[in-house]
């Protein structure tokens, strides 16, 4: 018996064939099983003959139209099989040739017979089967599931024999059913460029996707909408400003023009809109400022100056026009000289003094604002002697001081100074370093006019200033309320920072948009030391000003770094504070003295990291403070004791600070409910608040401090029972509810530096709840209600925002994963009060922790304080990465350089000297002076030609231009402490 049935004997094979053929005949009688939607042809039943050959193990079924199969194919298969067996047995080449010819002939006949077979014809039903593939899908070209042998592979190439032409011959165009490059094929098609508008009915509820909208048509519709609204309500200033900003959006669609032309056309459009708006709103100051800014961007300096002069002649009392006229001359490299600018200030003062008789309060404020700007200009040009004489005479005239007041003699011995200069000149330093060191030494020591007898020893005629030289800048202030403002301006000119620096204070003093007046690093210290009751984040804030102190970004005499005149200048500032404060009423006097005590605290904070510790400075300060507090007028002033306690804390005496605060609380009545005087009650609540904040401070915090807070707060109620804490909570809650029920009073800010009673009550209540329950959500809800309630009183709302940020920063420093509320509160506050220094310090720290790719500096509008905070954040990030040796440090450095380039193109802040000085400091720190030093010098001088410190810093960045720098200083008549004769000697010597 064979293993396979195919190789069994013939009888079995024949019987099996008969059975199969009989079965197939019976099955083919019905053709229902062949019914199919794609094959509807009638199929006749046919007789199938299946030949199972013994030569193969496979069953071959072949069909035909008339005769299904014949024995020919099986016969041929038999012959090919036997022939292949015989071929293996033959050894001679002749026999193999004969057999191969015979097999080839058989194969050829078999191919021709298979081609002659008829094919079935049927109707094709291909509806909804085929479609035109118009969208390329690259996934169809990948055959990842097949092995490499199953994938089709084509070699297409052209080969040449002999010479190959240098010019590439174009390949023949293959007529294929697909295109090689669909994009190229679409581009070569002739397109219909005529835009045909189709009228379609769109359902109102149907939302059109963003990629379907026609942006240009949308902008046209929006322009039409603005025009219609402005026609209906031309007095809407906010709508006019939005329409002006909208022109920047339209400029993005003008791609057919150059960038410079687009910018100019946009400014022209804005100018025409502003002029139309001023026709309807002639009294709007904001629109007038925009008009002057746009005029300055499209006109040369000389033409712009003439245009403004024409406007000033029409409206001589308009301070905005006077400021623009002065700035047009001051900011022009060609026109700026010190005498020209001072002549314009003189004319302005004369007109404002004449008009002050009609409305004293208004014109006194304008006169003081212009006086402050004039003093800042004198400081920038280096004319400290002239500046101080102007301040002194104005204070004597308006504060009723003695004629000999504020007169300081022999600040420093001139002979010692000459000896120091000789040591510098004898050193073999480069010429630029010799000049810089001599200039800075004299600049630090000279700020007061010398007498006529000392002039012969000094030899510098510009150091001798008499009252007649500044008589044009000395004017009486008619309204008595303006004396406090004059005192603040006088101290700001001496480089005393505002402590704290709030948005409302800057706005009230007119310093929000005064970008060209910022030239020295002292204004940056409130970023590191805000003085708003902060309890956390001290090291993070101090890291923001890293390198600023070492960079010597100061001007004139300074109180930060050690030099021969540091202590004399500090004594000079203290004496000025005391003289001004003692000549003011009680409330304003307290403001000035609190400001001075905070300034002393700031100096202690900054001196902690000095490499050389001077115990004499601390001892001298303590003796000065004790002498101040021993006076009868100051002995019972709780504000002064609070500030003295905080100075003790900064000196490292924490226990002494707590004892002073507790003693001050217990010195008088400890129950606020029993005090009727508003100021005394405010001072007591502020003591409680300061004590709580000091105990919760993260630098000195202990777990026992919470228990101490709960013990101290019991003093607020007179009853001493077991339920004392509940009574305190009820009392504070009632105070907060009364605040929410009554409308807060919107009054002028006369207390810039004194605490606010409502704010301190809310802070004490929230700190008590936080210590007792540790529930931050409850605290946030209270602040939200209070902030919403006092939205009509901006200075109080800003204080409450600060207090909320303080407690949130404390909480999220302990729980860093949950800072969502902090971020939300921060951005809400910056939207309303963008120039609050405490909020900006938190914002700068968060920016410094971001990677470079996450920082977006494409915003077109910056305030000068926001720009400075971004600079500090970038410096902190770059320094930190450089210390780690991280590759991202260079990306951060490039990002910071790019940020400075953006500032140089922003009209509102590009004239800020301090931004340019920080830019030059960055070049010095990272050895980029050779690449960018000369370029930055030319750009900075073109935008700030009056700022003497720009030239001083440029001598370090671009020392090869020293001679040119010195010549420009003399041409502009800026202050140069090295006389021309000494300068010639230095030039000839080296």
Task: Please state what every model-predicted region is.
Residues 1-990:
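Polyampholytic low-complexity alpha-helical segments
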């Amino acid at each position: 018996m064979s293993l396979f049935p195919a190789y069994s004997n013939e009888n079995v094979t024949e019987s099996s064939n008969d059975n199969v053929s009989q079965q197939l005949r019976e099955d083919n009688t019905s053709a229902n099983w062949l019914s199919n939607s794609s094959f509807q042809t009638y199929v006749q039943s046919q007789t199938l003959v299946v030949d199972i050959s013994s030569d193969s193990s496979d069953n071959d079924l072949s069909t035909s139209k008339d005769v299904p199969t014949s024995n020919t194919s099986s016969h041929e298969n038999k012959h090919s099989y036997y022939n292949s067996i015989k071929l293996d047995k033959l050894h001679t080449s002749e026999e193999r040739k004969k057999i191969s010819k015979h097999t080839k002939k058989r194969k050829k006949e078999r191919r021709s017979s298979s081609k002659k077979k008829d094919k079935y014809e049927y109707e094709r039903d291909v509806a909804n089967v085929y479609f035109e593939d118009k969208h390329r899908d690259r996934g169809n070209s990948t055959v990842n599931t097949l092995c490499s042998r199953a994938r089709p592979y084509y070699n297409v190439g052209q080969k040449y024999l002999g010479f190959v032409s240098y010019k590439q011959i174009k390949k023949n165009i293959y007529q294929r059913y697909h295109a090689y490059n669909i994009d190229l094929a679409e581009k070569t098609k002739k397109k219909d460029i005529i835009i045909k508008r189709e009228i379609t009915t769109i359902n109102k509820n149907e939302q059109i996707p963003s990629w379907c909208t026609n942006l240009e048509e949308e902008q046209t519709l929006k322009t039409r909408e603005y025009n219609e609204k402005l026609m209906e309500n031309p007095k809407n200033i906010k709508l006019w400003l939005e329409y002006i900003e909208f022109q920047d959006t339209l400029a993005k669609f003008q791609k057919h023009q150059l960038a410079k032309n687009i910018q100019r056309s946009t400014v022209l459009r804005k100018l025409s809109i502003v002029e139309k708006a001023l026709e309807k709103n002639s009294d709007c100051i904001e629109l007038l400022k925009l008009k002057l800014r746009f005029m300055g961007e499209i006109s040369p300096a000389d033409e712009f100056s003439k245009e403004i002069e024409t406007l000033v002649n029409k409206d001589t009392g308009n301070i905005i026009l006077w400021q623009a006229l002065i700035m047009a001359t001051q900011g022009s490299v060609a026109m700026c000289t010190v005498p020209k600018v001072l002549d314009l200030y003189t004319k302005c003062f004369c007109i404002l003094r004449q008009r002050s008789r009609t409305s004293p309060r208004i014109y006194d404020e304008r006169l003081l604002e212009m006086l402050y700007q004039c003093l800042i200009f004198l400081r920038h040009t280096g004319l400290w002697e002239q500046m101080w004489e102007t301040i002194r005479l104005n204070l004597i005239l308006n504060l009723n001081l003695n004629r000999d007041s504020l007169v300081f003699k022999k600040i420093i011995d001139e002979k010692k100074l000459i000896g120091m200069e000789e040591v510098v000149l004898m050193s073999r330093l480069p010429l630029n370093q010799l000049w810089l060191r001599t200039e800075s030494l004299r600049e630090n020591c000279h700020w007061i006019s010398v007498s006529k007898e000392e002039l012969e020893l000094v030899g510098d005629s510009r150091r001798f200033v008499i009252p007649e030289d500044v008589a044009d800048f000395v004017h009486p202030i008619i309204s008595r309320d303006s004396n406090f403002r004059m005192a603040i301006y006088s101290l700001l000119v001496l480089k005393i920072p505002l402590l704290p620096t709030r948005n409302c204070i800057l706005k009230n003093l007119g310093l929000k948009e005064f970008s060209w007046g910022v030239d020295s690093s002292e204004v940056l210290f409130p970023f590191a030391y805000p003085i708003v009751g902060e309890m956390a984040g001290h090291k993070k804030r101090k890291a923001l000003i890293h390198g600023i102190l070492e960079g010597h970004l100061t001007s004139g005499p300074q109180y930060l770094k050690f030099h021969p005149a540091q202590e004399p200048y500090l004594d000079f500032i203290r004496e000025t504070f005391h003289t001004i404060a003692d000549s003011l009423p009680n409330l304003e006097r307290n403001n000035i003295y609190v400001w001075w005590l905070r300034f002393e605290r700031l100096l202690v904070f900054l001196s902690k990291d000095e490499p050389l510790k001077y115990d004499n400075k601390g001892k001298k300060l303590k003796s000065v403070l004790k002498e101040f507090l021993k006076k009868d007028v100051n002995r019972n002033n709780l504000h002064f004791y609070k500030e003295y306690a905080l100075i003790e804390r900064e000196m490292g005496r924490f226990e002494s600070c707590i004892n002073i605060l507790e003693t001050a609380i217990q010195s008088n009545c400890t129950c606020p409910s029993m005090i009727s005087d508003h100021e005394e009650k405010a001072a007591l609540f502020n003591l409680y608040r300061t004590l709580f904040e000091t105990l919760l401070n993260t630098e000195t915090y202990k777990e026992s401090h919470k228990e101490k807070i709960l013990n101290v707060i019991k003093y607020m109620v007179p009853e001493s029972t077991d339920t004392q804490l509940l009574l305190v909570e009820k009392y504070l809650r009632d105070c907060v509810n009364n605040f929410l029920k009554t409308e807060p009073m919107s009054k002028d800010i006369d207390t810039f530096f004194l605490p606010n009673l409502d704010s301190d009550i809310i802070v004490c209540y929230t700190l008590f709840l936080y210590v007792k329950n540790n529930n931050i959500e409850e605290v946030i809800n209270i602040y939200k209600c209070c902030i919403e309630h006092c939205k009509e009183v901006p200075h109080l709302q800003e204080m409450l925002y600060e207090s909320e940020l303080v407690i949130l920063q404390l909480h999220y420093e302990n729980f860093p994963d949950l800072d969502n509320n902090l971020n939300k509160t921060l951005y809400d506050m910056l939207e309303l009060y963008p120039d609050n220094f405490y909020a900006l310090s938190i914002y700068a720290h968060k920016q410094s922790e971001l990677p470079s790719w996450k920082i977006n500096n494409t915003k077109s509008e910056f305030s000068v304080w926001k720009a400075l905070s971004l600079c500090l954040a970038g410096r902190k990030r770059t320094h930190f990465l450089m210390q780690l040796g991280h590759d991202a440090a260079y990306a951060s450095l490039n990002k910071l350089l790019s940020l400075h380039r953006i500032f140089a193109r922003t009209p509102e802040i590009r004239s800020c000297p301090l931004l340019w000085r920080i830019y030059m400091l960055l070049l010095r720190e990272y050895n980029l002076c050779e690449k960018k030093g000369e370029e930055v010098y030319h750009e900075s001088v073109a935008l700030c030609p009056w700022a003497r410190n720009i030239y001083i810093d440029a001598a370090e960045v671009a020392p090869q231009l020293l001679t040119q720098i010195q010549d420009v200083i003399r041409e502009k008549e800026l202050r140069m402490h090295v006389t021309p004769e000494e300068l010639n000697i230095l030039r000839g010597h080296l």
